[in-house]
């Protein structure tokens, strides 16, 4: 599977009106950094071809060709998990690769749609080691926005090498915006934004159903969409329990308002120093270098915020499905159904207490009611599950599979 690097804690750092989420091995909260040059857009010269048909307003988009030796080819991937999903068997593990949902659910996606914008390549990724958001000047950039379905993907081999990882190119840089070649001996900072669905988005690979979803996303301001089906595969629940009332198949549509910037990402294609990978991308004089924007779909289902790799749960979503109480009837859940669900004490759609449970061998569920840990994060609507999901999923933007980025949340949770 695509991912084996885990255990980094995510730190929430507030800068002005945006929240920064950084990654650290010690889990300590860092102090607020000073305002920085975060590699934001510095002009529209893309430094090379980035597709010759803009695909705006629902039109066709031509993915850019390989830019050739010395260039950077930017792709988007949801890993193989966006394509094949998360299976569940009696041998599934919370800490498996991929992780299993601890409550017995297999989850597959029909659509994982994101809108990518403001791709930028900057000089000097190590300008300030204490404040990685501070980078050098923009040397190449590409503006979208690009509407991408990571479940559909494209024809470029993903970083995992798995045939199920489908990745699609959205931009290419053959040279710097000043016409000079990228220096193969130099690393360049790489950053990108995930933004709200936009009317002028370049439609990269959405199918008919994806286009319908994207229209809804434009109306509602979603920047991420997780849409799919969850199927319960665990053992039969105890008679009379609330679990017996949960439908065994649930179709979900989770539209998330969580636009964020992913700044100066670490690069797991390069050699680590200790536990830390270098930041930035590096050209190869003999061939192009693929730079993969990677969306980790597991982040949206974690049970604790600002910490990497906590257990995955689907029970609190399924327990609020439309057919709760008639388990043989497939149910549906939308993000609107979860707005008033309190993560500090989950209840079913009918108001019953939802207990915590574990159906995997490497995780012990706490006694009593299922609760998620906001870990110091507050929400405009206190403890809203919809807001929790959006905030947690926003931490899922990476580079080259597992490269951690400095994450600036451009939204109020």
Q: What spans do the regions from the language model cover?
A:
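Ser/Thr-rich, Pro/Gly/Ala-heavy low-complexity intrinsically disordered linkers and tails
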Residues: 20-66
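A short, solvent-exposed, low-complexity linear motif enriched for acidic/polar residues
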Residues: 58-413
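Intrinsically disordered, low-complexity sequence elements enriched in Ser/Thr/Gly/Pro
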Residues: 1-4, 33, 39, 46, ...
């Amino acid at each position: 599977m695509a991912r084996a690097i885990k255990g980094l804690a995510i730190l929430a750092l507030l800068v002005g009106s945006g929240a920064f989420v950084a990654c650290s091995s010690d889990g300590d909260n860092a102090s607020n950094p000073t305002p920085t040059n975060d590699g934001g857009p510095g002009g529209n010269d893309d430094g090379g071809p980035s597709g010759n048909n803009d695909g705006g307003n629902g039109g066709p988009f031509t993915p850019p060709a390989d830019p050739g030796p010395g260039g950077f080819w930017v792709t988007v991937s949801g890993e193989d998990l966006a394509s094949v999903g998360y299976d569940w068997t009696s041998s599934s593990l919370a800490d498996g690769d991929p992780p299993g949902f601890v409550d017995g659910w297999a989850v597959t996606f029909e659509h994982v749609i994101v809108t990518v914008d403001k791709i930028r390549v900057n000089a000097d990724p190590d300008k300030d080691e204490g404040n990685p958001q501070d980078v050098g000047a923009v040397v190449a950039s590409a503006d979208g926005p690009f509407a991408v379905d990571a479940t559909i993907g494209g024809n470029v081999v993903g970083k995992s090498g798995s045939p199920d990882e489908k990745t699609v190119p959205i931009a290419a840089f053959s040279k710097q915006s000043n016409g000079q070649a990228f220096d193969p001996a130099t690393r360049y900072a790489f950053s990108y934004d995930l933004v709200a669905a936009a009317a002028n988005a370049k439609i990269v690979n959405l199918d008919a159903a994806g286009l319908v979803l994207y229209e809804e996303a434009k109306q509602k301001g979603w920047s991420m969409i997780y849409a799919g089906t969850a199927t319960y595969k665990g053992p039969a629940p105890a008679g009379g329990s609330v679990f017996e009332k949960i439908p065994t198949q649930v179709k979900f549509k989770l539209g998330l308002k969580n636009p964020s910037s992913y700044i100066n990402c670490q690069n797991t294609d390069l050699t680590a120093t200790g536990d830390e990978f270098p930041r930035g991308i590096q050209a190869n004089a003999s061939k192009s270098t693929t730079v993969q924007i990677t969306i980790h779909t597991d982040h949206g289902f974690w049970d604790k915020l600002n910490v990497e790799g906590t257990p995955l749960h689907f029970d609190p979503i399924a327990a609020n499905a439309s057919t709760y109480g008639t388990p043989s009837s497939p149910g549906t859940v939308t993000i609107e159904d979860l707005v008033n669900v309190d993560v500090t004490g989950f209840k079913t759609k009918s108001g019953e207490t939802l207990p915590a449970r574990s159906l995997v061998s490497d995780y012990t569920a706490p006694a009593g009611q299922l609760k998620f840990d906001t870990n110091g994060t507050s929400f405009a609507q206190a403890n809203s599950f919809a807001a929790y999901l959006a905030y947690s999923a926003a931490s899922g933007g990476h580079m080259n599979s597992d490269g951690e980025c400095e994450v600036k949340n451009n939204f109020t949770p």
